[in-house]
Curated annotation (Swiss-Prot):
This is Endomucin. It comes from the Eukaryota. Residues 118-183 are annotated as: Disordered. It comes from Homo sapiens (Human). Residues 118-134, 146-171 have a biased composition (Polar residues). One of its GO terms (biological process) is hematopoietic stem cell homeostasis. The chain crosses the membrane at residues 191-211. Expressed in heart, kidney and lung. PANTHER family: ENDOMUCIN (PTHR15869:SF0), ENDOMUCIN-RELATED (PTHR15869). Residues 19-190 are extracellular. GO terms for cellular component: extracellular region; plasma membrane. Highly O-glycosylated. Sialic acid-rich glycoprotein.
Length: 261
């Protein structure tokens, strides 16, 4: 680009001296329109005009440039510059659009998959095979719009969750209940069995002690040798009865003797 600009600057004084003013004005206008960004420092035209050699005779020297060559070169350079400037403009606009798209995308990042996570973490409940009820939870999902600003729009989508479960899961819950009841019964049995064993041991020990006491009481020397098992108190009571009967008979005999007399 710099080389083209330098060549154009060297060609400007010769163009001013030529008769093709209309072409120069058109080329200058196109150059002014297209060159927007690059800043060009143009030297003084007077010093350039002094250095340029203008022919006076009909023969063109080697260092001079004709009008046709100037026209062709200026048109080619003008078209080249316009194409370059248009390419630069296109790239700059594309870059700005990309920046805007990225900023919009970062702004519209919404944390909305909470509904999805709750749906995945939620467990179904009980079921009857005849009817299954469903509840609707409005979840919002991010969907990009086709507009050039690329801003995201939120649309609500109803999501259904089954409240009831299959019969196999119900059977599984019943099996869990049975397992819990069996565990509790095992704990009770582990407590009851030692108590029952202790009671049996106590009753056996009581029977053994009673048997030993009776054996010792039979071997007591106060009992008679003829093998009577009655205790002394019983014998005393028998003696008292015999004494009473004897006294009663003697009283009757005395009463009969008195009546006879």
């Amino acid at each position: 680009m710099e080389l083209l600009q330098v060549t154009i600057l060297f060609l400007l004084p010769s163009i001013c001296s030529s008769n093709s003013t209309g072409v120069l004005e058109a080329a200058n206008n196109s150059l002014v329109v297209t060159t927007t960004k690059p800043s060009i420092t143009t030297p003084n035209t007077e010093s350039l005009q002094k250095n340029v050699v203008t022919p006076t005779t009909g023969t063109t020297p080697k260092g001079t440039i004709t009008n046709e060559l100037l026209k062709m070169s200026l048109m080619s350079t003008a078209t080249f510059l316009t194409s370059k400037d248009e390419g630069l403009k296109a790239t700059t606009t594309d870059v700005r659009k990309n920046d805007s798209i990225i900023s919009n995308v970062t702004v519209t990042s919404v944390t909305l998959p909470n509904a999805v996570s709750t749906l995945q973490s939620s467990k179904p409940k009980t079921e009857t095979q005849s009817s299954i009820k469903t509840t609707e939870i409005p979840g919002s999902v991010l969907q990009p719009d086709a507009s050039p600003s690329k801003t995201g729009t939120l649309t609500s989508i109803p999501v259904t969750i089954p409240e009831n479960t299959s019969q196999s899961q119900v059977i599984g819950t019943e099996g869990g209940k049975n397992a819990s009841t069996s565990a509790t019964s095992r704990s009770y049995s582990s407590i009851i069995l030692p108590v029952v064993i202790a009671l049996i041991v106590i009753t056996l020990s009581v029977f053994v002690l009673v048997g030993l006491y009776r054996m010792c009481w039979k071997a007591d020397p106060g009992t008679p040798e003829n093998g009577n098992d009655q205790p002394q108190s019983d014998k005393e009571s028998v003696k008292l009865l015999t004494v009473k009967t004897i006294s009663h008979e003697s009283g009757e005999h005395s009463a009969q003797g008195k009546t006879k007399n």
